[in-house]
Amino acid sequence: MVTIDLITGFLGSGKTTFLKKYAEYLMDQGLHIGILENDFGAINVDMLMLHELRGDQCELEMIAGGCDAESHRRRFRTKLISMRMCGYDRVLVEPSGIYDVDEFFDVLREEPLDQWYEIGNVIAILDARLENNLSQQADYLLASEAANAGKVILSHADVATREQCEDTVAHLNRALEQIRCDRRIDPKKDILQKNLTDLTKEDLEEVSKCGYRLESYRKMDLENGQSFDSLFFMEEKIKPEALERAVPRLFSDKSCGEVFRIKGFVKNGAGQWMELNATPDSHTMQSVAVGQEVLIVIGEHLQEDKIREILKEEETCQS
């Protein structure tokens, strides 16, 4: 049977960064792996971010979002059936930061997938600097993605204080209580607290054997509530410098809505692709070999006109 791992994490927690390290570790062990990417929205930016992993030992597959839950479930099942024919030793599933974890378990219980795949690990990535004031829907996602995790990795721990790390674990346990889940995260047993880029071979070996839990909790219907939005800005022709100025405004200006994450690609003056990855606490802009002219803004109650207005203002602003 093919071992399949699920890697979850709320928006901007660092799932893709972790996935790169984890995939490299597995390939170093001689494994042939398949990575199944699922993004929240119709365009899968994370596929481009993982482009460098593609090679003889690693293939990338994708399921685009932008559809209803039942259609997405069918796509997931169909993709797993086709990936079974590829001879992978392990499949890594990285869903979007907005994901119904039950879909993973439910689909893998169906025939013939239950005869082809065995669940190895459920790994949850959580930003150690978690925002205290999250909506009820965001807290639900946070708790549901961690409830069944064999290991919770506190990312960005190198720039978080001890108090922030403790508050984040306490917040997670409150969120678990709110959804009537009996599990409580034990910082000593369940948490790996480390900067993702500093994970060692020993750390990754531990994570690769962490397993998973099967917990029950009260479900919330996120689809009908339309809690989260994703907006796509195609071919905005905005320069990296202007985007750097716009990003803090988009997070701080509440007339834009509650922005959780901004990611995408723009070209600099030399024609080089630049990758943006931003959360309210930090953002990076770095050169990459492959890109697509698109910005994706993810959050709650987003106001497209206001966001577009800020992008245009910064592009026309003389620095």
Regions found by a protein language model. Give the residues of each.
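A short alpha->loop->secondary-structure connector
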Residues: 111-117, 142-144, 169-178
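Nucleotide-state-sensitive switch-loop elements of NTP-binding domains
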Residues: 2-8, 13-135, 140
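C-terminal accessory "lid"/substrate-recognition subdomains
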Residues: 42, 148-151, 159-291, 302-305, ...
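A short, charged/proline- and glycine-enriched loop
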Residues: 1-2, 291-292
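Short glycine-rich or small-residue beta-strand-to-loop segments that form or flank ligand, phosphate
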Residues: 92-93, 151-154
